[in-house]
Amino acid sequence: MRILVTNDDGITSVGIKALADAAIRRGHEVLISAPSDQCSANSQHITLTTPLIVHEKPWEGARAFSVKGTPADCVRLGPFLTDERKFDFCLSGINNSENAGPAVYYSGTASAAREAAMAYIPAMAVSIMKGAGERALETLAGMAVRLAERFSGETLPRCTFINLNAPNTDPEAWKGFKVCPLSGAYFKDNYVRRKNPYGTTYYWLDGEEGSAIAMEEPEPGSDYDLLNRGYVTCSFLGPYQDYNADYLEKIRNFRG
């Protein structure tokens, strides 16, 4: 397969190296188009009013490009960095933190996969809980590439992508592989009011338990729940859902 690899942690991250190198070892043709800077929580932001500065970087077995832009920019630009203008799959990651539950709507990693899926490229976002070691990264990278191979020559529904997450424990401790729904557990935010040395008031996101990511209790069987219990989780995420039929009667006679 011709695989486009991107991420939101930047082209120098250990996660993207593990993922790209796993695809190269499996014999795939790989092109890396990744942000030059850390772009976590950029969601699907694209650049419209400034140029995208691109530098080719050395990478054994692949062509690699550092892009002064967002993860979604990197995906949109990817086909223009190769003469073929076509990819069979897009792998985004490995993100240095899980992307489960509502995090997928903020995540640059997940949004890069969504951007690819919008452009008719089958895609997968790959993430692992913070603190994972090298063996866990390499194991997850290999798993992601083998899972992508299952979809070689197939088309997922447009805008639908695979979201893969793993615990940060040694792979031998992983309890299994589960297809599951997203958790609806939301963040417990705590914005702390402070003053800088010049007396200017600012607010700093400091989670309820001293972390920027404190969560409500996840629902049993959801991705966050299963991750916390030691499972690798997989979800197929699509964007098109509305509740028009549920509320049609309420607004049937509304004329503005």
How should these model regions be labeled?
Residues 3, 13-81, 85-86:
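A cross-family phosphate/adenosyl-ligand binding-site feature
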Residues 9, 38, 70-71, 95-98, ...:
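Short glycine-rich anion-binding loops that position phosphate/pyrophosphate groups of nucleotides
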Residues 22, 112-116:
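Hydrophobic/aromatic ligand-binding patch that stacks against planar heteroaromatic rings
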Residues 33-35, 92-95, 126-127, 164-167, ...:
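Short beta-strand segments
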Residues 89:
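Short, Asp-centered acidic motifs that coordinate Mg2+ and/or phosphate
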Residues 98-107:
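Glycine/threonine-rich flexible loop motifs
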Residues 124-151:
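Short, glycine-/small-residue-rich phosphate/pyrophosphate-handling segment
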Residues 157, 167-256:
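C-terminal accessory domains and tails appended to enzymatic cores
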